[in-house]
Design a protein with these regions (language model features):
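Flexible gly/pro-rich beta->alpha loop and the following alpha-helix that scaffold active-site loops
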Residues: 1-30, 43-44, 48, 52-53, ...
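Short glycine/proline- and charge-enriched loop/turn segments
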Residues: 1-3, 55, 60-62, 127-128
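Conserved hydrophobic/aromatic beta-strand scaffold that supports enzyme active sites
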Residues: 70, 116-118, 128
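Catalytic beta-strand/loop cores that center a nucleophilic Ser/Cys/Thr
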Residues: 76-122
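Acyltransferase
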Residues: 129-161
Length: 161
């Protein structure tokens, strides 16, 4: 599939409002790709609107969008608890990324060139990954692990007897 991008300000407005509503309600939030960027913006961070040297992050014009990319999951993060700390090969296809990480968030993963590939809140279950665990051309185990963590975070606490 050739890659292309568009801007939809209304979709961004609605997405930011939904993210903020879930955060304010204390609900878990999992963002993938643009969702990760919007989590950062929601907390006051910024994004890189167009990565100049994109070759690590997506296919070129007319090529498949998603490529294999090696990222480093940082130890001591929620993402490391879910996926394991250290290097991880993921599917990537983006020309934008988190730039300045919002003060309430921390970096959870980085690409080899330093681009932020994961952000999270240190105490609330708010997590964003720039990569695409849902791409079935790559391993699906990271997707299953992320979804299991997300579902567990949203499950009601067991009642004490």
């Amino acid at each position: 599939m050739p890659n292309s991008y568009g801007v939809d300000a209304e979709a961004d407005r609605v997405s930011l409002a939904m993210i903020r509503a879930y955060i304010d309600a204390g609900r878990p939030v999992l963002g993938i790709c643009r969702g990760s960027q919007l989590i950062n913006v929601c907390y006051g961070g910024t994004i890189i609107s167009d990565i100049t040297d994109y070759h690590l992050h997506r296919g070129g014009p007319g090529e498949h969008l998603f490529i294999d990319e090696k990222v480093e999951v940082l130890p001591g993060t929620r993402l490391a608890v879910i996926l394991g700390a250290g290097p991880l090969v993921v599917r990537s296809g983006h020309h934008q990324a988190v730039d300045n990480v919002a003060g309430e968030l921390r970096v959870a993963a980085r690409a080899l060139d330093g681009i932020v590939e994961g952000v999270e809140h240190p105490t609330d279950w708010v997590l964003g990954v720039q990569f695409h665990p849902e791409d079935d051309d790559g391993p699906l185990e990271p997707l299953y692990q992320l979804l299991a963590g997300f579902i567990a975070a949203g499950a009601p606490a067991p009642e004490a007897h």
